[in-house]
């Protein structure tokens, strides 16, 4: 598998350098510091970081997940609405990659936040949805981790005979399968499918010994005498990087090139805020996730946020790095019965859609 090595953001290594693109202006006055009202009730002035385009009248159904990345910043500040005032933007909440797969399968979405494993599953038989990856929201590090209850367990090697809960089809599931396979424990550990909101209850009822999960459930388990023994950053070191991506249907993307150009500029601004002004971005994260500002800032340290310029490079959309990672993910999931079968030749390699990124970086 191909291991991708983007620059680590502040808190886990050096902060990403700012993308000095003339098309992106400094965003000022967008965030009201200390704002606690839900963004759906936000009545402040909407500010677009680029020249708004009222000629775009696209109707877009966009799904989001409670993951601390630029997509939440974009949603909270209503940047898409500000930059495309005549477009019809509908935001839908999804709780997991499995929910996203079902929604794409029923043609209920145009664009969605989705993990690298679920998007591969959606593109594979029997669903075989024609999806394109249009943005990398983050590369997952310590934000997804294996938390165990027994204090005597210090490593994955101690987990033989234990039961681990994880949302099936998620990036956490992929990381867990990778780690178990590397340790030779695939047949020695019980793995059960639990949604994130069911994991804490199963933990408290002693139905599971451990869980590979993300925030806020991760912190809840740690508060219940749990401790971390492994993370998705370690799985990436084994050649299995995981991502939170944004994907869209090929039909929607092909039919709406101007929308995709503006959408890409807006996502780039969300990422810029995370890397250059993390305290400002954390205000949006705190509102969307319903957590304290300080806690929101800490959440950001578990992820890497590739800039627009980095995403345009050979390691991602400008070369075959992302395509190779998606292909490797599919091949691994097929060996672990995570998907029924591999898609036809070329499907995973053609999933990255870099046209809009290339256009706005010219």
Q: Could you tell me what each predicted segment is?
A:
Residues 36-186, 191-193, 209-212:
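Short, glycine-/small- and polar/acidic-enriched structural segments
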Residues 118, 188-191, 197-290:
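Pocket-lining segment of extracytoplasmic ligand-binding domains
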Residues 31-34:
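Bacterial signal peptide processing site
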Residues 25-29:
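C-terminal motif of bacterial Sec signal peptides marking the signal peptidase cleavage site
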Residues 326-362:
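Conserved C-terminal helix/tail region of periplasmic/extracytoplasmic solute-binding proteins
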Residues 3-17:
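Bacterial N-terminal signal peptides that target proteins for export
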Residues 88-89, 187-189, 290-301, 339-348:
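Short, surface-exposed acidic
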Residues 255-336:
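Secondary-structure end/capping motifs
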